[in-house]
Swiss-Prot record:
InterPro entries: Adenylosuccin_syn_GTP-bd, Adenylosuccin_syn_Lys_AS, Adenylosuccinate_synth_dom1, Adenylosuccinate_synth_dom2, Adenylosuccinate_synth_dom3, Adenylosuccinate_synthetase, P-loop_NTPase
Residues that bind GTP: 12-18, 40-42, 307, 333-335, 415-417
Keywords for the protein's UniProt record, in alphabetical order: Cytoplasm, GTP-binding, Ligase, Magnesium, Metal-binding, Nucleotide-binding, Purine biosynthesis
Leader sequence residues: none
Protein localization: Cytoplasm
Species: Rhizobium etli (strain ATCC 51251 / DSM 11541 / JCM 21823 / NBRC 15573 / CFN 42)
Family per similarity comment: Belongs to the adenylosuccinate synthetase family.
Gene label: purA
Record: residues binding IMP: D13, E14, G15, K16, N38, A39, G40, H41, T132, R146, Q226, T241, R305
Protein name, entry field: Adenylosuccinate synthetase
GO cellular component, one term: cytoplasm
Oligomeric and partner information: Homodimer.
Record-listed Mg(2+) binding positions: D13, G40
């Protein structure tokens, strides 16, 4: 028996929600360890769709404990709204099935406002990142700057005013520079005190809770948000998110030691998508790209933004296998490729006349790379709902094997539709 860390191996939107839900039946605890409510996923259970963006996937399954770790930035208003929305769908959420790290950073209204102001200014200069404008980045900045308001601070009204003064000293200086009205001390105090009673019942010393449960033999599933190529260090900087999204963050963002993380499962889409700005070597702007977007329903769960689509990039996923220490992958949306006469897989790049096997870190070099492809024959038969290798066309199996060989990691799970049971299990990560 082992614990499992689930990470996206591309630019997010790989189908982590379904896989995490599928694995959560085998887990006792599901932990979010980074990001905020900027990355959403949809779970389909018995025909009912649940849209989550902050809460761990395990929260919709009875008998599971959901944990929001210290690596997550928590918007208390978004948290309350998501709890209320799920409650209206019949999901019970109490401290018996949800814990929030007392040292997790809070997202405030001033973070959202700063995020939007920066994006607007960057749009005018052509340098926008394409954030969700939800305050994620500014909240992480305050965390690193040691001026953040944390969950535990809601319980200490004696020291809270001084902490509000500290964060406002920074933000009001920024707002003056941007020509925007300053935020009053009372506005932030009112904002925090209005949510305290709703948030504080869920707070816990998460690292201690997880350590005790681990020692009792609990199976723990760590749920990553976004994808490895959006990692603040290892992604396509500066077009990245504001946190570490690789598997190592599961330890830092939960307080559990890295030796206890276990199996690293990389969720990998059978083609490539990206939301927002940034390099995308295999992007298709032709009818095939449109086909992938329409058939794959490539629109963001949180923002509704249309995703850019392209061929599978084995060079990029190979990079993610290395930076995450991926044990095996879950290959998703294979069924979207049904009907294409031929398929291409990127195996490397040409850069200034030289062949390279990885995407360079330099923004300028990333813009100049040209993908090198291998071409495979497609298949006409449907793979939708396949639950065994015998259900797959020969060419689909060949495609999967080619992916495994090129990225240097085996397929542990294969997903053939949004339905959780339409999954081919090769290796159970919890039993590895």
């Amino acid at each position: 028996m082992t614990n499992v860390v689930v990470v996206g191996s591309q630019w997010g939107d790989e189908g982590k929600g379904k896989i995490v839900d599928w694995l959560s039946e085998r887990a006792d605890i599901v932990v979010r360890f980074q990001g905020g409510h900027n990355a959403g996923h949809t779970l389909v259970i018995d025909g009912t769709s649940y849209k989550l963006s902050l809460l761990p996937s395990g929260v919709v399954r009875p008998g599971k404990m959901a944990v929001i770790g210290n690596g997550v930035v928590v918007d208390p208003h978004a948290l309350i709204a998501e709890i209320e929305k799920l409650s209206a769908q019949g999901v019970t959420i109490t401290p018996d099935n949800l814990r929030i790290a007392d040292n997790a950073t809070l997202i405030l209204s001033l973070h959202r406002e700063l995020d939007a102001m920066r994006e607007d200014a960057a749009s005018n200069s052509g340098t926008k990142i394409g954030t969700t404008r939800r305050g994620i980045g500014p909240a992480y900045e305050d965390k690193v700057g040691r001026r953040a308001i944390r969950v535990m601070d809601l319980a200490d009204l004696d020291s809270l005013p001084g902490k509000v003064d500290r964060i406002l000293t920074h933000h009001n200086a920024l707002r003056r520079g941007l020509g925007v009205a300053e935020v009053s001390h009372q506005t932030i105090m009112d904002e925090l005190t209005s949510v305290a009673e709703r948030v504080l019942p869920f707070r816990d010393t998460v690292w201690l809770f997880l350590d005790k449960e681990r020692r009792k033999g609990a199976r723990i599933l760590f749920e990553g948000a976004q994808g490895s190529l959006l990692d603040i260090d290892h992604g396509t900087y500066p077009f990245v998110t504001s946190s570490n999204t690789v598997a190592g963050q599961a330890a830092a963002g939960s307080g559990m030691g890295p030796g206890s993380l276990g199996y690293i499962l990389g969720i990998t889409k059978a083609y490539t998508t990206r939301v927002g700005e940034g390099p995308f070597p295999t992007e298709l702007t032709d009818e095939i790209g449109q086909f992938l977007g329409e058939k794959g329903h490539e629109f963001g769960t949180v923002t509704g933004r249309k995703r850019r689509c392209g061929w599978f990039d084995a060079a990029l996923v190979r990079q993610s296998v290395a930076t995450n220490g991926i044990t095996g992958i879950a290959l998703t949306k294979l069924d979207v490729l049904d009907g294409l006469e031929e398929l291409k897989i990127c195996v490397g790049y040409m850069l200034d006349g030289e062949q390279i096997d990885h995407l360079p870190a330099s923004q300028g070099a990333q813009a100049r790379v040209e993908p090198i492809y291998v071409t495979l024959e497609g298949w006409k038969e449907s793979t939708v709902g396949a639950r065994s290798w015998a259900d797959l066309p020969a060419q689909a199996i060949k495609y999967v094997r080619q992916v495994e060989e090129l990225i240097g990691a085996p397929v542990a799970l294969l997903s053939t539709s949004p339905e959780r049971d339409d999954t081919i299990l090769v290796t159970d990560p919890f039993e590895d």
